[in-house]
From Swiss-Prot:
Entry binding sites for ATP: 30-37, 147-150, 176, 184-187
Subunit structure: Homodimer.
Gene name, Swiss-Prot/TrEMBL: panC
Organism: Rhizobium meliloti (strain 1021) (Ensifer meliloti)
Involved pathway(s): Cofactor biosynthesis; (R)-pantothenate biosynthesis; (R)-pantothenate from (R)-pantoate and beta-alanine: step 1/1
Identification of the protein by name: Pantothenate synthetase
Additional detail: The reaction proceeds by a bi uni uni bi ping pong mechanism.
Pfam family, one: Pantoate_ligase
Family designation: Belongs to the pantothenate synthetase family.
Length: 291
């Protein structure tokens, strides 16, 4: 694996592969990799001739009081993991490489990006869309891989690609989980031992929603209310978003019928924010009662 830090060097390195007609897969990350990231790498390697992973802690997507300064970083560790994973190129630019002067151009998907997580993190998704667009312009991948754990982000990127006719296929990869069901996340390392134990309630809350829907609850507000009550059983959990939405548009759902619905959770434990979600198909819910 070759590590590259400048845009010009990466473009030059990829040009010969592009001329040879080789397909390129991109796995954008902020580093401090875990098994979820490595599943993205594995998928990219199975579907492309050349795999590029990027590591860049993007300041545009962090708010003034967020964790930019303490976001975990360990480039040597990440390089070893990516080498073992078969990545061909690691693009690891500095802030001055990506943003040599203050950005005047911002890519925003305002409707999708201002709700749910965007409502409690204003400007976050504009920062994401901007850096992802820049990475797409630099790498020019055939395919780009994102985890379904960040479902709102995934749908925003898909809409951005569609609206701007960007020549890349966006592929969502199912969430990888730890033994107790907690979604793998670089931010899990922030949790204290007590908070980590408490965080197991997040995937259990998704199970609870699926049970409710399988039992015949059709009012989204009722499901949301009861999931909030369920989360209230864990004193360390502070839910910020509990929302049932349409999985394609992220718009509100008036009633739970035959169409799948998406439950999005955004829960704080101490200073750590955890995201999770599940798409639930009412007729095939795992907890459906046997007739």
């Amino acid at each position: 694996m070759r590590t590259i830090s400048t845009i010009a060097d990466l473009r030059e390195a990829l040009a010969e592969h592009r001329r040879a007609g080789r397909s390129i897969g991109l796995v954008p990350t902020m580093g401090y990799l875990h098994v979820g990231h490595m599943e993205l790498v594995r998928r990219a390697g199975s579907e492309n001739d050349v795999v590029v992973a990027s590591i860049f802690v993007n300041p545009l997507q962090f708010g003034a009081n967020e964790d930019l300064g303490k976001y975990p970083r360990d480039l040597a560790r990440d390089q070893a993991l990516l080498t073992d994973g078969g990545v061909d190129f690691l693009f690891a630019p500095g802030v001055s490489d990506m943003y040599p002067r203050p950005m005047e151009t911002v890519v925003d998907v305002p409707k999708l990006g201002s709700e749910l997580e965007g409502a409690v993190r204003p400007g976050h998704f504009a920062g994401v869309a901007t850096v992802v667009t820049k990475l797409f312009n630099i790498v020019q991948p055939d395919r780009a891989y994102f985890g379904e754990k960040d479902f709102q982000q995934l749908q925003i990127i898909r809409r951005m690609v569609e609206d701007l006719a960007q020549p890349v296929t966006v592929i969502g990869v199912p969430t990888v989980r730890e033994e107790d069901g907690l979604a793998c996340s670089s931010r899990n390392v922030y949790l204290t031992t007590q908070e980590r134990r408490a965080a197991a309630i997040v995937p259990k809350a998704l199970d609870e929603a699926e049970r409710l829907i399988a039992s015949g609850v059709t009012e989204p507000a009722e499901v949301e209310k009861r999931v909030l009550e369920f989360l209230a059983g864990e004193p360390l959990a502070r839910p910020e978003v509990v929302a049932l939405r349409d999985p394609e548009t992220l718009g509100p759902v008036s009633e739970i019928e035959e169409k799948p619905v998406l439950l999005l959770l955004f829960v704080r434990f101490g200073t750590t924010k955890l995201l999770d979600n599940r798409v639930i198909a009412p007729k095939s819910a795992r907890f459906a009662k046997v007739a």
